[in-house]
């Protein structure tokens, strides 16, 4: 999978991220309620909150997987930094952007991904995501529910 492009506003994005002062703090309990709710509401095994700096995707809360970070250049979520609101892939093997990702072809063999951009000062600083190893549908009701959760 090709790495996501660097956003044109990368410097401002990184400044907004650093202004939060939580990037290098380990997993955070305050986000766990959100990720647990997503797993239950959408019947997915994995949900997480992440922040993405210049090189690394840092996991701030995760359900269903033991992961604290991954390189930005292998991250599906890094692509979400480039959109205004969200990316939804009902089957990652059918999406040209992601079908060759190591997260799709090896290891977890993910099939479903929904990632919402998390914003600070108008900048995309991270993601609220849910994933599964099997395809799912993602309809308008799901979109509205996830939009509500992501705008906390």
Residue spans of the language-model regions?
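Intrinsically disordered, low-complexity terminal regulatory regions
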Residues: 1-73
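Generic recognition of well-ordered alpha-helical segments
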Residues: 33-36, 75, 82, 148-151
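Short coil/loop residues immediately preceding or within conserved phosphate-binding loops
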Residues: 44, 113, 125
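Regulatory sensory and allosteric helical modules in signal-transduction proteins
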Residues: 45-46, 52-62, 67-111
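Sensory-domain boundary capping and coupling elements
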Residues: 77, 118-132
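A short, aliphatic-rich beta-strand micro-motif
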Residues: 111-119
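A generic structural motif
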Residues: 134-136
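Amphipathic alpha-helical "output/dimerization" segments
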Residues: 138-152
């Amino acid at each position: 999978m090709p790495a996501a492009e660097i956003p044109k506003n990368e410097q401002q994005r990184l400044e907004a991220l650093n202004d939060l002062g939580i990037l290098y703090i380990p997993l955070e309990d305050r986000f766990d309620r959100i990720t647990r709710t997503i797993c239950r509401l959408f019947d997915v095994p994995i949900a997480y909150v992440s922040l993405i700096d210049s090189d690394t995707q840092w996991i701030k809360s995760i359900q269903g997987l033991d992961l604290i970070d991954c390189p930005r250049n292998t991250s599906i979520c890094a692509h979400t930094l480039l959109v205004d609101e969200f990316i939804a892939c009902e089957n990652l093997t059918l999406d040209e952007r992601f079908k060759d990702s190591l997260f799709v072809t090896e290891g977890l063999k993910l099939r479903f991904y929904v990632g919402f951009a998390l914003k600070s000062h108008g900048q995309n600083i991270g993601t609220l995501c849910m994933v599964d190893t099997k395809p799912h549908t993602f309809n308008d009701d799901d979109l509205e529910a996830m939009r509500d959760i992501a705008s906390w």
